[in-house]
Amino acid sequence: QKLSVGLGAAALAPLSSSASLFPTFKKPDKKLRVALMGLGGYANIVARAMKECQLATLTGIVTGTPSKIAVWKSNYGIADKNVYNYDNLSAIANNPDIDLVYITTPNSLHHKHVLQVAATGKHVICEKPVADNALQAGEMIAACKKAGVKFYVGYRLHFEPHTRELVRMRKAGELGRIMHVNNYMGFKIGDPTQWRLKKALAGGGAMMDVGVYALNGARYATGEEPVWVTAQETKTDKVKFAEVDETVTFQLGFPSGVIASCGTTYNFNNYERLYVIGDKGFAELSPAFGYGPIQGRTHLGPMNQPLITHQAAQMDGLADCILNGTPDPGMTGEEGLKDMVVVDAVYESLRKNGEKIYLGKK
């Protein structure tokens, strides 16, 4: 994601605490018709949330597990002709009932699946992390541009009211000059056999999966792109975390001189916060990155922002971008690329025993 954090962060528009999330939606002639690809736990969350959507509707599924098909057809009214597997995915190209495919497959499959969907001419949303590395992310962006399709990454918090208010305050100067950022996100992971603990499917561990929340948050909290990275890993369970990172702390240096202290883990709970301090005030979100409810406070008191269904807001918001031409809130593939450049640097620093890794020109 190394183009300019300022672009993504600046696009986070302000939101009044008394306003509904999207009070002025232009209603198009049709809804955005969406197929979900990869019917795991998160796909179920997205599907349920989409029942609240004004501008998007679930019309199709792509799955490699035939036993899931009947339940999904029953729960969401999916027609037989809109059910696909990974072998006949290319046939979506000829299906007018599907405008966009939302990819929620394991991390290391994102690159392959985005290229396949782009080749069908359908728009793409891909869950984060967008890819295994920045090189793959760049290839995905290029493929979507060549195909003439929109490519978004599932940064749902870019539509979340507390997050948007924090960015509004920073942009308006209400926090003053940003002095420090402290972000962390993690949880104690369960089932030791799950794909998130297998590098071939996950691409990495806590840093790849949930560390990107702390990283992305540091970027929009400062409105800057980091110029250097240092990182350290703690591994207390070398059996469970044999293939992937367990707990990572990392520091991001920004052009203004601000240093963000960040952390992520797969080995303990109660680790979720975004805290930005300026010379005029502060803003804190805690919980900051989960599915909600997000809670926030500032030097002025509680934020008192509306509580929303994140995935419904994301899908309606991106449908508005596609159907009505509304500018996107920093969720394109380029935003995913910016994060992956930093993730690559974190892993490089870990390999080099915490060495400072410079981004761009040294």
Name each region found by the language model.
Residues 1-21:
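N-terminal export signals
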Residues 14-53:
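C-terminal segment of N-terminal export signals and the immediately downstream linker at the start
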Residues 55-76:
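NAD(P)-binding Rossmann-fold cofactor-contacting core
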Residues 81-143:
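Beta-loop-alpha module in the N-terminal Rossmann-like domain of NAD(P)-dependent dehydrogenases
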